[in-house]
Every structure is written in C-alpha cells, then in structure tokens.
Amino acid sequence: MLSTPLRRRAVGAIAIAAGAAIALSACSAPAADADSSSDAATATSLTDFGTLADLETAAEAEGALNVIALPRDWANYGEVLDAFTKKYPDIAITEQSPDVSSAEEIEAAKTNAGLDTAPDVFDLGLTVALANTDVFAPYKVATWDDIPDALKESNGLFVGDYGGYMSIGYDSSKFAAPEALDDLLGADYKGAVAINGDPTQAGAAFAAVGLSTVQSDGTLDDFQPGIDFFSKLQKAGNMLKVDVTTATVASGETPVVFDWDYLNAAHTADNPDWKVVILPGTGYAGYYNQAINKEAPHPAAARLWQEFLYSDEAQNLWLKGGARPVRAEAMSAAGTIDEKLFSALPAAPEETVVPTEEQSTAAGELLGTEWAAAVQ
C-alpha cells in the first residue's frame, strides 16, 4: 500500500493556499448555539459522545451536513454520499461547490464563519492542510489505530483518507502511449497536454509537477526540474491550459491529461478509447486528507461523517472508485476489504516517492514564486 467534473483539489495530497472567497449564501442565518452543539464541537473522539448510537442521535438532531468540493465522479464520492444518506436519512447533505480547490474550501469556511452555510468538513491536499491547522477541530475516529502514522496528524487535526499514483491519461484513437516524460514534448502532442488545475492551488496539478521532477532525475527536495519540464512543454506549444473535467475528456477537448490514476481510469466509462499509463521509473503517490471545520455549524454530523468515511463500508466504496483507502492494509489483514477490487488495482511502480510535509511546504513556496512565469 502507499506510505484525494474533476475538481482542482489543492495542493499536495500527501504528497497553496490561495483562492477567491466563496460566498455560499449572502443571506444565511447564523448557526445555532445550543449546549449540545457546543459539546459536540469540542468532542475529540467517539468516547466524548458515549457510543456511536449517541453520536448518531446528536447528528440526527442537527439534521444537516454541509460538504464541499466533493464531485460525485471523484473516487466514487457519489456512492459514498448516497450511502451516508441511506444510512442516515434524517441528515440532509448539502453538496456545496463540488469543483473548487482545497484552498477555496478554506476560504469558504472563513467567508461563511458563523453561518449555517459554512462547510462542516473538508477534503484537502496536504500543503493546504498544513497551512490551515488553526481552522480544524482535532478528532480521532474509532478506527484511528488502523491508519498509518505517516498519514495522519498526531492529534487528529487532519487525516489521510484515500490516495493513488500520478498517471497520464490519453485518447488512444489520436495519440500513441507516452513511454517517457519527454515524449510529451514531441510535435505529435501539440496543444494537447493538460494538467488538472493550477499547481499552486490544486493537488493533482501539484503532483504532476512532482512526478515530472522525479522523472527528470530530480528529487522531491527541489521541484525545479518539474517546473522546467512544464516550461519546455509550454514553449513547445504542447501545454493545454484548459480546466480538466469529465466533459472535456469525453468531448476530446483535453485529450492528454496528467491526473491521479483513479480519476483518469474513471474516464474510460465515457470514452472507450481513453487509456491510462503510469510511466516506468520512479512513481509519485499521494493522499488527500479529511478535516473538520472547528466552527462547523453541524459539529455532531461532521464527526459522524468522519466515522462513516473511515468505516469498512466507505473505505470499500473509495476502493470501488479505484482509489486506495488509507485503511487498506489493516482491512486486508482483518479480511474486511473487498479483495476482488483490491487485487484489481494497477500494479504500483517499483520505486515510489511520497513527499514529506517539509518537502510539500518547500515545493509549494517554490511553485508560488516560479510557476506563473515558467508557463507564460
């Protein structure tokens, strides 16, 4: 197992903060301040509620949950959301702004602070999570011990949830499979190569630069070789600056795409000619992270959502979407993982890198100063 329409998820998936504020509702009412809500807002584990049934009761009393930046075709989130609704029909989920970046998730929380429209929970790239721990409430789910230490903040401020490998998807009716990164610099790929977002804000795009770095004989201590590759791609006229969505892939508008393997693989449902390749050599892996808004308007529902996401049921639903759930190793040992789906995942590269917190932070700073000029 590894040591998160397509949204432009912000930076790092274990691999900056920026983005416009999002006014989700201009006339929203302030969130209610009941004693029970206050108790839920300070709960750091299931023990603070008593039992799961007690947490369920508290969440159902709130009756609502605000999620943000969860496209239904991203890692099978549609089925995850529907499963939660089926299990808890008295909790109405509001799916806010599914295509925004993680940086914009944080801006939405700040813009809507104190309102019942504020997001209750986040799904974030590591760099944005690291930069915004003051926005999060610590919480350790019941399955906390199953989660590798390297993939969780020690107090539960943010926790890895699902991950994958950076890949290249392409329309095989128009292009040959790239066998090496530099193949994409050739004339055959003129105006065709897109990344999923802006790497200063979006995790998948950040990872594309990371992959390009290690494929260019660099290391994750310095993303400059990856930035240089995309500068060459731009100068060759091959870089396509179009936001990648399911629709752009299906229509052929974005025919070659750097993205997570589970997202690229999902496009085969809409385009039978769509193929996915993980380049030989060093691979790049990453996870997204869950966090709870410390000012969540529905704090009990936020914590119940976390408990659900780290249950066997939801972890297997992410697996169904082609992502690698963070509890996969523990579930495999316990016999609770869907072995058919688990064994069907693409083979991992022989050598895989995952950026540390320090490397992610340094890369984010470098991209912030160098990226825009490099791809002009």
Segments predicted by a language model, with ranges:
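Extracellular/periplasmic bilobal clamshell ligand-binding domains
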Residues: 335-376
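Bacterial lipoprotein signal-peptidase II cleavage site
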Residues: 24-37
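Periplasmic-binding protein-like
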Residues: 163-167, 227-232, 238, 271-294, ...
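A ligand-binding cleft/hinge motif common to bilobed small-molecule-binding domains
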Residues: 127-133, 250, 255-274
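Sec-dependent bacterial lipoprotein signal peptides
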Residues: 1-25
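Extracytoplasmic ligand-binding site segments that recognize negatively charged/polar headgroups
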Residues: 66-82, 94-110, 116-253
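Short, polar/charged alpha-helical segment
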Residues: 49-60, 70-92
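Mature extracytoplasmic/periplasmic domains
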Residues: 284, 288, 292-352
